[in-house]
């Protein structure tokens, strides 16, 4: 068994697709109309056959309060791994991405959190090698 698709609830599939492809450089894998919405998945260009990220409309009545509570408590909805957090932080800041926390060490990882403009906080994480520790 393996994870095939994971989802993130977004307030606008179009806006989310634009942010995640233009800022994070993810690629559209599937874009299939389904009623009022789309089955819209993205993949990392580093792993095009890997786990797909579904941009799930947050239309369910429970979604908005859940997302608002997570954001109010500064809890990231999900986490993406990067090789060089400091470089990615600077690249994204230069593209206008708003970070809610700057890069910081947390044990054997370094993390930073940004706002995806679609109602979520997203954590970037770099696993530190023995050289960094």
Regions found by a protein language model. Name each.
Residues 50-53, 57, 64:
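Short, charge-rich, low-complexity interaction segments located
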Residues 43-47, 114-117, 127:
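Active-site beta-strand termini and strand-to-loop segments that position acidic
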Residues 52, 121-124:
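Short glycine-/small-residue motifs
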Residues 8-51:
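Core segments of cupin and vicinal oxygen chelate
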Residues 1-3:
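Extreme N-terminal starter segment of soluble prokaryotic enzymes
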Residues 131-133:
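Conserved small/polar residues in nucleotide/adenosyl-binding loops
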Residues 11-14, 60-121:
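Vicinal oxygen chelate
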């Amino acid at each position: 068994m393996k994870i095939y698709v994971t989802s993130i609830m977004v307030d606008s599939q179009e806006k989310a697709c634009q942010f995640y492809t233009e800022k994070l450089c993810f690629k559209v894998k599937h874009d299939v109309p389904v009623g009022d919405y789309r089955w819209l998945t993205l993949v990392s260009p580093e792993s095009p056959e890997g786990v797909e990220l579904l941009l799930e409309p947050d239309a369910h009545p429970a979604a908005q309060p859940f997302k608002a509570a997570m954001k109010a408590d500064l809890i990231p909805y999900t986490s993406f791994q990067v090789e060089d957090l400091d470089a990615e932080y600077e690249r994204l800041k230069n593209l206008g991405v708003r970070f809610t926390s700057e890069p910081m060490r947390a044990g054997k990882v370094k993390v930073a959190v940004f706002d995806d403009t679609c109602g979520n906080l997203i954590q970037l994480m770099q696993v530190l090698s023995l050289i960094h520790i």
